């Protein structure tokens, strides 16, 4: 829902050379995604009769995926493709090594945890990349929300894309199978 408007905001700030607004908008958009999405997903998992460990790791993975999705919008400006690829390979390496270790140790949720570790490593790597590239400060700026007024069609398009991407899953949830 946010990604197209945030992408437009980042593109405009880069064009206007307002680089100091980039990191604060990343923190603010990430916070909004997590504040809105995490409780909803946690409730869904709890209602799906999942164990506490599965709910905890599911919520952790959800948060990591939200942040990775968001940070990739910001990474498009960096054009440091070798460093970005290193982040993906880091995730693969951490996931494979910790997954094999969990199999060897016969851990019940080991594979799930290894995926969380892999995405977490990639997330931290990518956030570090945008911090290295853009002027860093730890403030949040919700200035990008003004772009929802100006580019409401982008927000609608983002919603339609989201529905289209996940419609088949929702149909399966409520279908007879």
Each predicted region: which residue ranges?
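Alpha-helical transmembrane segments and their helix-entry boundary regions
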Residues: 21-22, 80-87, 111-112
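Junctions where cytoplasmic loops transition into the N-terminal start of transmembrane alpha-helices
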Residues: 24-33, 154, 177
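Hydrophobic alpha-helical transmembrane segments
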Residues: 87-132
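Interhelical loop/hinge segments that connect adjacent transmembrane helices in multipass membrane
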Residues: 125-159
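Helix-terminus/linker motif at the lipid-water interface of multi-pass membrane proteins
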Residues: 162-177
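Interfacial/gating helices of multi-pass transporter permease domains
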Residues: 1, 146-150, 174-177
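Alpha-helical transmembrane segments of multi-pass membrane proteins
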Residues: 1, 30-34, 42-75, 85-86
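Transmembrane-helix boundary and interhelical linker motifs in polytopic inner-membrane proteins
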Residues: 2-27
């Amino acid at each position: 829902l946010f990604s197209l408007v945030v992408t437009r905001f980042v593109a405009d700030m880069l064009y206007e050379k307002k680089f100091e607004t980039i990191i604060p908008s990343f923190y603010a958009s990430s916070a909004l995604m997590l504040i809105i999405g995490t409780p909803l997903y946690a409730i869904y998992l709890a209602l799906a009769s999942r164990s506490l460990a599965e709910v905890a790791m599911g919520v952790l993975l959800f948060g990591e995926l939200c942040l990775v999705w968001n940070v990739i919008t910001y990474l498009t400006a960096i054009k440091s493709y070798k460093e970005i690829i290193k982040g993906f390979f880091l995730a693969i390496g951490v996931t494979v090594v910790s997954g094999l270790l969990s199999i060897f140790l016969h851990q019940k949720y080991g594979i799930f945890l290894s995926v969380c570790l892999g995405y977490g490593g990639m997330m931290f790597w990518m956030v570090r990349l945008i911090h290295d590239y853009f002027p860093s400060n730890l403030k949040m700026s919700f200035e990008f929300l003004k772009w929802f007024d100006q580019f409401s069609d982008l927000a609608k398009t983002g919603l339609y894309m989201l529905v289209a991407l996940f419609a088949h899953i929702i149909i399966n949830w409520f279908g007879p199978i």
